[in-house]
């Protein structure tokens, strides 16, 4: 009889423990139901990158003095600077400048160390192509400013995105900027 009471007690303790586990699972499920989704439907919605996002490099031809600092600080010696020396003014004159974004690691060293600030990072991150040779940008392609997602009339901004918090993922789940194409 004593073993039957112990068996019933063990069974009831296991049933209570199982119901606790199920309750904890329901709490986690209900907690996740109130959160915003972490993913977006990419072609139709776009995230607005943060202010310090390192996207495609923008180049201003008129500001460049052909000092080649960008080539020296680049970990892969990527920027190709072609110049000729003008003897009458005793200065270098820039002939061409190009960067191959198929090889670029977007470290930002060239932008940071440029003495004339002729290089800057843009918000553009959509650089995919079917031909890798199209990723080799010359000074004309580098000089074009990208159309900002915020200024594009075919895309609608939904809410704000904040990368400045220490709890990036927590803030990401609470408030973010998502853009949506207008129908």
UniProtKB/Swiss-Prot annotation:
Keyword set includes 4Fe-4S: yes
Function as written in the Swiss-Prot or TrEMBL entry: NDH shuttles electrons from NAD(P)H:plastoquinone, via FMN and iron-sulfur (Fe-S) centers, to quinones in the photosynthetic chain and possibly in a chloroplast respiratory chain. The immediate electron acceptor for the enzyme in this species is believed to be plastoquinone. Couples the redox reaction to proton translocation, and thus conserves the redox energy in a proton gradient.
Record-level GO cellular component terms: chloroplast thylakoid membrane
Species the sequence originates in: Anthoceros angustus
Catalytically driven reaction(s): a plastoquinone + NADH + (n+1) H(+)(in) = a plastoquinol + NAD(+) + n H(+)(out); a plastoquinone + NADPH + (n+1) H(+)(in) = a plastoquinol + NADP(+) + n H(+)(out)
UniProt KW keywords: 4Fe-4S, Chloroplast, Iron, Iron-sulfur, Membrane, Metal-binding, NAD, NADP, Plastid, Plastoquinone, Quinone, Repeat, Thylakoid, Translocase
Domain of life according to the entry: Eukaryota
Free-text remark on how the cofactor is bound: Binds 2 [4Fe-4S] clusters per subunit.
Subcellular location: Plastid, Chloroplast thylakoid membrane
Membrane topology: Peripheral membrane protein
Domain 4Fe-4S ferredoxin-type: 55-84, 95-124
Cofactor(s) required for function per UniProt: [4Fe-4S] cluster
Molecular function terms from GO: 4 iron, 4 sulfur cluster binding; iron ion binding; NADH dehydrogenase (ubiquinone) activity; quinone binding
EC number: 7.1.1.-
Lineage of the organism: Eukaryota, Viridiplantae, Streptophyta, Embryophyta, Anthocerotophyta
Binding residues for [4Fe-4S] cluster 1: 64, 67, 70, 114
Binding, [4Fe-4S] cluster 2: 74, 104, 107, 110
Cited InterPro entries: 4Fe4S_Fe-S-bd, 4Fe4S_Fe_S_CS, NADH_quinone_OxRdtase_chainI, NDHI
Listed SUPFAM superfamilies: 4Fe-4S ferredoxins
Name under which the protein is recorded: NAD(P)H-quinone oxidoreductase subunit I, chloroplastic
Pfam families listed in its UniProt record: Fer4_7
Any GO BP: photosynthesis, light reaction
Family membership: Belongs to the complex I 23 kDa subunit family.
Gene: ndhI
Subunit structure: NDH is composed of at least 16 different subunits, 5 of which are encoded in the nucleus.
